[in-house]
Design a protein with these regions (language model features):
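Class I S-adenosyl-L-methionine-dependent methyltransferase catalytic core
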Residues: 1-166
Length: 166
């Protein structure tokens, strides 16, 4: 996600972080999780497939003082999703989730069914007050997004960002 897109996104989200839990399913550098923590999220779950990038995220978490709040998993988001959902649902005090689904754009086409199922699962599992944030390439059809939610979609070329509240 480009810097200006991220700034616009966090401006749109406003105070959704207060005591919420951030989940970044395609973490990359971890910036969305770290930004969420810096804005009041109590914890962040970051999933990154690339082992070097996951290691870098761990180092950054430590440098920023988020090493106890950031739960970093190296692996496939599609395979780890259920485990993360179970962990989040076991919390004695349920908090809203802020779920970021911002994969490499090609995954929206190459893994269409898996992406749709991933979104459906998080939408069905997230507690009331949660939000789902998706970044898609501007030409990606919005039909991939679960149609049982109302999506606020904005264009930030070359991306479009869709947010739904649960």
């Amino acid at each position: 996600m480009k810097d200006r897109t991220r700034e616009a996104l966090f401006s749109r989200l406003g105070g959704k972080f207060d005591s919420g839990i951030a989940v970044d399913l395609f973490a990359g550098t971890g910036v969305l999780g770290f930004e969420s923590l810096s804005r009041g999220a109590t914890e962040a779950w970051l999933v990154e497939l690339d082992s070097k990038a996951a290691s870098d995220i761990r180092q950054t978490a430590k440098q920023l003082g988020f090493d106890t709040q950031a739960h970093i998993r190296c692996g496939d988001s599609f395979l780890l999703a259920e485990h993360i959902i179970q962990q989040l649902q076991q919390s004695p005090t349920p908090s809203p989730w802020l779920v970021f689904v911002c994969p490499p754009y090609t995954l929206w086409k190459e893994q269409y069914d898996a992406m749709h199922q991933l979104l459906q699962r998080f939408c069905a599992s997230a507690p009331e007050g949660s939000s789902i944030v998706c970044e898609l390439e501007e030409k990606t059809p919005l039909e991939i997004l679960p149609n049982n939610l109302e999506w606020d979609v904005r264009l930030y070329r070359p991306a479009q960002v869709a947010i739904a509240d649960i």
